[in-house]
Amino acid sequence: MMTYQEIFNEIKNKAYFKNHRHVLIAVSGGVDSMNLLHFLYLFQDKLKIRIGIAHVNHKQRSESDSEEAYLKCWAKKHDIPIYVSNFEGIFSEKAARDWRYAFFKSIMLKNNYSALVTAHHSDDQAETILMRLIRGSRLRHLSGIKSVQPFANGQLIRPFLTFSKKDLPEIFHFEDSSNRELSFLRNRVRNNYLPLLKQENPRFIQGLNQLALENSLLFQAFKELTNHITTTDLTEFNEQSKSIQYFLLQDYLEGFPDLDLKKSQFTQLLQIIQTAKQGYYYLKKDYYIFIDKFSFKITKIVPKTELVKEEKMLEYDSNLCYRDYYFSFMPKSNEDQGQVSIPLFSLSSIKLRSRQSGDYISFGHFSKKIRRLFIDEKFTIAERQNAIIGEQDEQIIFVLIGNKTYLRKACKHDIMLAKLYIDKLEKG
């Protein structure tokens, strides 16, 4: 068992709170979180932080309300702000966890806390690794939980992660009787499986934590060795061996945490990319992948309502920015080869929008569907997605796509009244 001073001496050089002034502590009332609360309360001046308490009453035990009342009383006595939420809905481990972290996130955002602090320790880490092994998780997910990671508008910090449960001091806390219920996998791991495995190897927990560390280092090394590869570039991707492609795609999917593909879905996705057949392929949870001649990209599907909202109206003699372009009725003073000018035969407002089904543009003696124009000119899917349609008086007067502009052919008796000028915005 360690004292709080000894714990402080070990973590002070890790500078967990260097960039934080207001931190929110997740407190259940159990021994771990009560230790965290007392520790941060005692050392908040040395750490240069101010603390707040977040507590979720899961309403699953008769003692829950008295535990909530105790924490409110403690917070009032020590002049610490406290935020409480009551769980609603059908209870499960996952539902409760999702509720807690959604609540913590909302409190951080509303009250300007830049860090959430939880009391996870090395025993929790070992339990998590063993649970993931039992569930058949990917190798990547055996890296365990991190001491610091992004969360909400700031970070999630676990300062006790390098300490074991037996390192924490004895302190007043509440015993959660549900921690003994074997209907929950974590409780079976904690109360049944780990004790048996520790009989075979007393250092089994340390072994699991070392596995998590080495696994984390392995994937960090892979990232560093492949950071010169543009994963979404089909030429570069297909130049790699099958094994490297496998982990490059896993790395790329880390950017879409809510996509959560099953192993069979991942294998199917990898095969789609390897064959590089152009088109759209729907995945799940409103995500799809589209592949063109040169690259692939995973994107969340934009609802039709959002596409409608994306439309903008440009009034004569005004200006606006739309997507990556600046639209105005005044030319630049200097000669700019990059500026596009469009003759206007009407001064009515111009609608800027995306392509819609059935769109066509008149080229004088003939008209052409814009969909067919895109196909014939061999524009990539990404370029088609970003094309801008200019519509005036219910006619399409221009199409802006890639580095090209297509104009409606003027009629014989049209008189030019003005010009519209388009400039590509520089990305800083």
Swiss-Prot record:
Keywords: ATP-binding, Cytoplasm, Ligase, Nucleotide-binding, tRNA processing. It holds the Pfam family ATP_bind_3. SUPFAM superfamilies: Adenine nucleotide alpha hydrolases-like. One of its GO terms (biological process) is tRNA modification. It comes from the Bacteria. HAMAP family: tRNA_Ile_lys_synt (MF_01161). This is tRNA(Ile)-lysidine synthase. The lineage of its organism: Bacteria, Bacillati, Bacillota, Bacilli, Lactobacillales. The gene is tilS.
